[in-house]
């Protein structure tokens, strides 16, 4: 049985106020967010450790996203918890020395992902695998700047998904990072911050302005 839907504890002004500690927001999210939501936003684990790596903007975004998506604790079936959750918990148990061998911690991810259609939860791409995707990219105002999904039946027959090696910089970083968390058949909505999209320069040829937050609907149809 689903838990009662929590009420918003703070206004936007209170959330951004320095008087509200990050730990309070993290505790609220851990108390009320589902495991998969917390894993997606890297909010699992000891509150003190999470507070060290998560900045205030990321926590405010996660707080608002929790109420937008309604992914509260008890709202998802236990089986919905992905391998990503297990991996996060395993990584927390690793000794700290191993971190020196990895790339420096860059803080929270610069994207959020909402699952629109579940995948098989078995086949996940690895770095260097070729992935095949259908996608539509829009700006925040809803303007479509790119898509490979055809509407006319004639064009549909000739349409092919986008294929590329994932995790090696062939596409924007938001795509590279997000697709590694998706399983075959999954469709997701990605909201990518400018830092992991086209940054300060934008992409004038594609009519993407500077510092643009991009929204994609991506379906991972196959992995080679």
From Swiss-Prot:
Question: GO terms for molecular function, please?
Answer: peptidyl-prolyl cis-trans isomerase activity
Residue list for modification Phosphoserine: 36, 152
The alphabetical list of record keywords is: Acetylation, Isomerase, Nucleus, Phosphoprotein, Rotamase
Q: How is its activity regulated?
A: Inhibited preferentially by rapamycin over FK506.
Q: Which residues cross the membrane?
A: none
Return the EC number: 5.2.1.8
Which residues does the record list as N6-acetyllysine (modified residue)? Answer: 99, 170
This protein's superkingdom?
Answer: Eukaryota
N-acetylalanine sites (modified residues)? 2
Function according to Swiss-Prot or TrEMBL: FK506- and rapamycin-binding proteins (FKBPs) constitute a family of receptors for the two immunosuppressants which inhibit T-cell proliferation by arresting two distinct cytoplasmic signal transmission pathways. PPIases accelerate the folding of proteins.
Recorded hits in PANTHER family, A to Z, give:
PEPTIDYL-PROLYL CIS-TRANS ISOMERASE FKBP3
Q: State the protein's name.
A: Peptidyl-prolyl cis-trans isomerase FKBP3
Look up and give the organism this protein is from. Oryctolagus cuniculus (Rabbit)
Taxonomic placement = Eukaryota, Metazoa, Chordata, Craniata, Vertebrata
The gene from which this protein is expressed is: FKBP3
